Amino acid sequence: MLHSMLSASRAPQRSAVRLCAVLAAAAVTPVAALAAALPAPPQTFDSSYVAPRGAILRVAAGQSLQAALNNARLGDTIVLQAGATFTGPFKLPNKPGTGWIYVVSSRLSYLPPPGTRVSPANAANMPKILAPNGLNALTTVANSHHFRFVGIELAPAPGTTLNYEVVAIGNFDTSPATLAHHIVFDRCYVHGNPNSNDRRGIEMDGAYVAVVDSYINGFQWADPVVDTQGLWAFNTTGPLQIRNNYIEAATENVMFGGADSRAAALVPTSIEIRNNHFFKPLSLISSTNYAVKNLLEFKAARRVWVAGNIFENNPLKSQTGFALLITPRNGGRAPWSVTSDIAIVGNTFINVGSGFNVAGFNDPGYPSTLMTQRILIRNNVVGVTGLNGADGREFQFINGGSDYIIDHNTINNTALSRISTVAVVESTRKISNFVFTNNLSTHSAYGFFGSGVGEGTRALNAYFTYWTFSRNVILGRPAASYPGGNFFPANVAAVRFVNYSGGNYALAAGSPYNNAGTDGMDIGANP
């Protein structure tokens, strides 16, 4: 399924193999071009809701949830009284047998059906599992497995002043053999409290862990050097699934890495991030208390699929305003850290300061990482606004790397910055096997720019080994500075969008860029 998605635009049946062939056949450049390799797909799994059929254990207000967790057998359902409060920490025991233990609301039938995202408006029909001060609501033991929480509110208890993680899956495991596994949060409301320091919603350091159809918000810490996340993982084999959620946090809405995995086999792997809404409140801009960085960050991750999401609002504040980062980091104990085989396909970015920051290695002078390889950024619609004074860089490529495909993206750049760019490249290492094709950019002050050498062909020759740069539409830049086979209209009107002022950036009938891509498709994103 992933490979067809990677190659899909209007024709989902086209294979990834054909995409590679098309990209390899793009216009010849002054440097002989090779086809960049596509990302390897993640291992995926089915997290669908299946109505349970086992014994029912009912837990009313004032009764023991931990006793129910201890006594339940795989296949049973624990029904918690809606509106009741259960204060943890609760441990999910390791049970023998097969099947799942469901933990559900007594008013589950009043909640949206499977496949539908919940919101805070549904909280009245949910029981509450709360975290006491400084502790978790739910934790795992070695090999906890097959728990599904459906229609539950999870949060710090009222009156708490700090919480590190509402839900902690994982125990700093040093081997895949002890990971918790098969744990799902389905239609849950996971949140921080307005007047406390709440660092994370769910740590997902297990295998076959999913968060689906849920609402996650309110994670912020009143210290500008403390990062917060809605969802986070750093130490797991995966697979992981994040599907159809609303996710909000002050620093990184979702992050992978940021702490050193305990073994090379525990770099987060096989991650599916699909159909979510990542959102930052604009009120964070005026606050001096919180670290505000990006919407999605990969510091250590392999085989990732990011598709069909909305990413909304990302300002310059604690960082430079990039919405999505692929930047490998090693804190000193994990030289195996890597960001590789990552596909960013068919997403919408709204009101972001800058777009994508991709690094090949950790920054010079810091502990080493493995090299970033096989990155695909395709069919995304990106609204770069320079929010809160960001530079308006659509792409940034630093510190080398290999096999990057940037293809069929539409970037509407309205940043007022005098240094806005289609891309900035800064590196002491060259990037090999680089494909930049069929992209459409509405504005930039410096075009595709290489630090210290200028734009266009000079930047490509200076910073890339084996590159293809073809059939891009870049408004207002000098054609003579670029390889042949690209387009440089003077203004937006010359592109002929369906409704530019109304935010519809598809090409209208009669646009000179209809069917003009290397693959015969419209230039720009083809949803």
Residue spans for each PLM region:
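N-terminal secretory signal peptides that target proteins for export/translocation
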Residues: 1-16
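Acidic, glycine- and Ser/Thr-rich low-complexity intrinsically disordered tracts
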Residues: 38-55, 118-127, 429-437, 442-527
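Beta-solenoid repeat scaffold
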Residues: 48-51, 55, 73-82, 87-128, ...
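Parallel beta-helix/beta-solenoid
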Residues: 73, 81, 95-98, 124, ...
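Feature marks extracellular polysaccharide-active and adherence modules
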Residues: 81, 104-106, 142, 150, ...
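Residues in short coils/turns that link rungs of repeat/solenoid architectures in beta-rich domains
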Residues: 110, 156, 161, 192, ...
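Right-handed parallel beta-helix
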Residues: 124-293
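Beta-propeller domains
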Residues: 251-254, 258, 267-402
